[in-house]
């Protein structure tokens, strides 16, 4: 969520594909129940440009916005999140199974990242606190 940098939906998979993108967006929409016309900004990955994903967005009143090809600065907030995820989580641990990885990823995203880790962009507030303040 761009407002407070909060992770709204996060899924792990060995394949980045349209089904993963749709399922993740479905979870986000169920959790937040946003107004029609909410903007989903992404890169131009195949999973986001697929007709199936475009139809899913249209059906759910999600307006797609995409960064220019080869320009990660257009999607800087997500790029920063993935950098944080790698350096504060993924590179620090060894996971014995995908189930353990999924569990620990859930704890990091929805626990530490959203409720414990402050962000400069939020004036030192956690993503959760920033969302509560904005509401």
Q: Which role does the model predict for each range below?
A:
Residues 10-34:
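Active-site beta-loop-alpha junctions of metal-dependent nucleic acid enzymes
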Residues 34-49, 68, 123-127:
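Acidic/histidine-rich, metal-coordinating catalytic segments
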Residues 40-44, 58-77, 94-97:
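RNase H-like polynucleotidyl transferase catalytic core
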Residues 5-6:
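Residue-level signal for well-ordered, solvent-exposed loop/turn and beta-edge residues enriched
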Residues 1-2:
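Short, acidic, Ser/Thr-enriched surface-loop or helix-capping motifs
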Residues 58-62, 84-135:
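C-terminal domain-tail junction helix/linker
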């Amino acid at each position: 969520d761009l407002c407070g940098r909060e992770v709204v939906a996060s899924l792990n998979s060995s394949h980045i594909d349209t089904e993963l993108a749709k399922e993740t967006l479905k979870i986000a929409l169920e959790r937040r129940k946003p107004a029609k016309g909410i903007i989903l900004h992404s890169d131009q990955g195949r999973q986001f440009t697929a007709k199936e994903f475009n139809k899913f967005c249209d059906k759910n009143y999600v307006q797609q916005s995409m960064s220019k090809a080869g320009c990660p600065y257009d999607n800087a907030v997500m790029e920063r999140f993935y950098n944080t995820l790698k350096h504060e989580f993924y590179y620090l641990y060894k996971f014995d199974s995908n189930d353990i990885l999924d569990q620990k990823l859930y704890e990091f995203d929805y626990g530490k990242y959203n409720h414990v880790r402050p962000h400069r962009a939020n004036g030192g507030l956690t993503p959760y606190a920033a969302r509560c303040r904005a509401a």
